[in-house]
Design a protein with these regions (language model features):
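N-terminal secretory signal peptides that target proteins for export/translocation
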Residues: 1-9
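Bacterial N-terminal signal peptides
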Residues: 12-26
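Boundary at the C-terminal end of the N-terminal hydrophobic targeting segment
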Residues: 25, 31-33
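Short, glycine-/small- and polar/acidic-enriched structural segments
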Residues: 34-186, 190-196, 209-218
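Ligand-binding clefts/hinges and TM-proximal coupling segments of bilobed small-molecule sensing domains
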Residues: 147-164, 168, 244-276, 317-318, ...
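Pocket-lining segment of extracytoplasmic ligand-binding domains
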Residues: 170-267
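Secondary-structure end/capping motifs
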Residues: 233-312
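Conserved C-terminal helix/tail region of periplasmic/extracytoplasmic solute-binding proteins
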Residues: 304-337
């Protein structure tokens, strides 16, 4: 018989204890699975209707089903690019003037997915103004500053309608959409570019819908922006995020009652306004989520209207990378050219 080795006996005992405790070769527990989920931080400028796919993916467990542990962080659109560059967040839930401007200014980031490819805005007027012709020489309010996405979308829509933007006086009004309604009611302006749910309130008060701007202009609303290094080094994770958001968007399209309940709970609207907002919002959704050239070109145009980046010809690939969204769309069964 071989002499007893105290060290060998101690090691064997340790192995037996680990096996008994389920720590060696045991199946993964729920807690361990949670640890292995991809931990991802996504910023959003605010929980508005454009953030609905993001909120649905979180609240309906779609991120979790795709193996992701997602933290949503509210960060102003103007500050999000710096947070992305500094590693404080992994993705920006948006594609708009702020993110595109940051990319064109040197941030190595790309738009990789669109939530909507149209924005839900109506040009509305005071009751006595029944047409665009009636608004000649009158003031039209837009939220924020002139040269922003909604302002440029209005200019494009006016051009498509045969009108000249120079025939109207554009007024930028800071604050929320409700401020535009107040400006209309007080007769400070004769027209205003308004989005849901304020649109519905304005219509009930007798204001006229003159132009459905969203149906006339391709312009991204919501979306996803990521660093180039993330796209290149973590394509599997990026596709999981895109798949989660696209799946949430598909569920939104299919399930009005479920989505209206989410709008009521998260966005604090009443049932009627939530239902009307849903009807308007779902018409803007990008079918596949693949970034399109027309939307990106109109975003660039909105920046150039402010006198920025006018000295260069800007290619789609400088701003967007549609490859992973295309892969996800094909995997989900969409017909992609």
């Amino acid at each position: 018989m071989l002499p007893r080795n105290p060290l060998r006996s101690l090691l064997l005992l340790a192995v037996q204890v680990f096996v008994a405790l389920g720590l060696l070769g045991a199946p993964s527990t729920d807690a361990e699975s949670q640890e292995r989920r991809s931990k991802v931080r996504i910023s959003n400028a605010g929980f508005t209707i454009t953030a609905l796919p993001l909120l649905a993916a979180r609240d309906w467990g779609i991120f979790t089903a795709n193996g992701m542990d997602v933290e949503l962080i509210v960060i102003a659109a103007s500050l999000a690019p710096a947070a992305l560059a500094g590693g404080d967040i992994d993705y920006i839930a948006g594609v708009g003037p702020a993110s595109v401007s940051a990319t064109l200014s040197g941030l190595p980031a790309r738009a990789i997915w669109f939530s909507s490819d149209r924005i839900s805005y109506w040009l509305m007027s005071r009751p006595q103004f029944k047409s665009l012709e009636d608004l000649k020489g009158k003031k039209i309010a837009v939220s924020g500053g002139l040269g922003g996405t909604n302002h440029v979308a209005l200019v494009i829509a006016l051009e498509k309608s045969g009108a000249n933007q120079k025939d109207h006086v554009m007024v930028g009004i800071p604050g929320q959409q409700i401020q535009l309604l107040y400006a209309l009611e007080s007769a400070f302006v004769e027209g205003a570019l308004i989005s849901p749910p304020v649109t519905f309130n304005a219509y009930k008060k007798g204001f006229n819908k003159l132009l459905d701007v969203g149906s006339m202009v391709e312009m991204p609303g919501g979306g996803l922006t990521a660093l180039v290094k993330t796209i290149q080094s973590k394509p599997t994770e990026v596709k999981k995020v895109i798949r989660s958001l696209q799946s949430a968007k598909d569920e939104i399209r299919k399930s009005k009652a479920k989505t209206v309940d989410l709008i009521v709970r998260i966005l604090k609207m009443d049932k009627e306004a939530s239902s009307e907002t849903y009807d308007a919002f779902q018409t803007t959704l990008s079918p596949t989520g693949i970034p399109n050239r027309a939307g990106i070109e109109n975003l660039v145009r909105s920046l150039q209207a402010q006198g920025r980046f006018t000295d260069r010809k800007i290619a789609f690939t400088e701003i967007a990378d549609d490859r992973l969204a295309t892969e996800v769309a094909k995997e989900l069964g969409y017909k992609v050219p």
